[in-house]
Amino acid sequence: MTIEDRGDAHVITHSLAKHTLSRLRDTTTEQVSFRKGLVKLGRISGYEIIDGAMETEFTAFETPLTETTGERVTGLDDVVIINVLRAATPFVEGLLKAFPRAKQGVISAGRDEDAGMDADGEFPITVDYVKLPDISEGDTVIVADPMLATGSTMCTVLDHVTDEMPAAGVEDLFVLSAVSAPDGLLRVGDQFPDADLLTVAIDDTLTDDGYIVPGLGDAGDRAFRTT
């Protein structure tokens, strides 16, 4: 398992994940390569979740030559992936390569840039659309958004997700990002202590406008070639 415990979060240290993130940060990486990079990062992250959080069991079966036993991952059919529109769309596409039978939910949420960040380092968040599947106690829930900056958007999204969860909770609740800022990790961790925060990188600087530095820019704009 290539995940490092960083106190407030678990950092994916897989070499290919770090390589892919470096490509995403690079301004010379054009739209198609950027989008494909997010897909790849989602798939790697999915495999890391399987390796680090899911159990296996031995099962009997037949090969073309004989009877034998082998390991199979349990819980692959009990995964719920929440796509925070729109930047997470290619990220989630990669997750679905690891969890092809996952149920999917979408939440369209974004911060009010015109209102700006308040004295507590939070943005007002607008939620335009919510569509979530049924969530059961045995489910592994993955809420995916490439950038976790102030944590304002993620906390709002998690409010909606946890409202749909059973009272007893779920098997695992992951908050998955490509790049995170310490302020956002602390905010999400404080408000949702049962969530496992999983990221590929933690960048130290958050600007007064709420952008992560060095970061990778606006993931949605770079993936969809919009400004």
Curated annotation (Swiss-Prot):
- Pfam families found in the cross-reference section: UPRTase (PF14681)
Instruction: State the name under which the record lists this protein.
Output: Uracil phosphoribosyltransferase
Please verify whether the record's keywords include Glycosyltransferase: yes
Listed EC numbers = 2.4.2.9
Ranked from the top, the taxonomy reads: Archaea, Methanobacteriati, Methanobacteriota, Stenosarchaea group, Halobacteria
**Sequence positions that bind uracil:** I212, G217, D218, A219
Sites where the protein binds 5-phospho-alpha-D-ribose 1-diphosphate = R86, R111, D145, P146, M147, L148, A149, T150, G151, S152, T153, D218
Major enzyme class: transferase
* Reaction equations catalysed: UMP + diphosphate = 5-phospho-alpha-D-ribose 1-diphosphate + uracil
| GO function term, MF aspect, one | uracil phosphoribosyltransferase activity
Q: Which cofactors are required for activity?
A: Mg(2+)
Q: Which GO terms describe its biological process?
A: UMP salvage; uracil salvage
Q: What's known about how it's activated or inhibited?
A: Allosterically activated by GTP.
Write down how the cofactor binds this protein: Binds 1 Mg(2+) ion per subunit. The magnesium is bound as Mg-PRPP.
> In the UniProt record, which is one GO cellular component term?
cytoplasm
Q: In which pathway does it act?
A: Pyrimidine metabolism; UMP biosynthesis via salvage pathway; UMP from uracil: step 1/1
Record family assignment: Belongs to the UPRTase family.
Amino acids binding GTP? K36, G37, L38, V39, K40
Keywords on record: Allosteric enzyme, Glycosyltransferase, GTP-binding, Magnesium, Nucleotide-binding, Transferase
Q: What does this protein do?
A: Catalyzes the conversion of uracil and 5-phospho-alpha-D-ribose 1-diphosphate (PRPP) to UMP and diphosphate.
